Amino acid sequence: MMSSITKKPIKNYLECGCNIGRNIDQLKLAMPSLVPSIIEISKPAFDYVTSHHNFEHAFNGAILDSKLPNSHFDLVFTMGVLIHINPEQLIDHLRHMFDYSNKYVLIGEYFNRTPISIEYQGQKDRLFKRDFGKLFIENFPVE
């Protein structure tokens, strides 16, 4: 991915589900000139991360409720978030990510060749593994 970024550099990014901002901390160290934006559903995590970082856009709520500018972000990414989205709503979440991006979408999630639901913290239907990349490519026009 980094070799692609040198061909089409990025100036800003949106993290969907940033929690307390660990990825933001690392991106700030690696690429300090990037302008960050976030979507975070947890109010305590949102309050924490917004007290430690400045954002172009910061939305506290679900991605499906967000109204950020389309085609605005050079990179839209999520890490360990989509695995918790009910499969019936997954395409809608991916569509928001696709719509917000103007260059790159990065999905870092648990992988399984076939969709599977796994018990998570003693609860059923809270963690879903699948091939998220394949699902994205099959549903959105990507290069």
Where are these regions (language model features)?
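Nucleotide-sugar donor-binding/catalytic module of glycosyltransferases
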Residues: 80
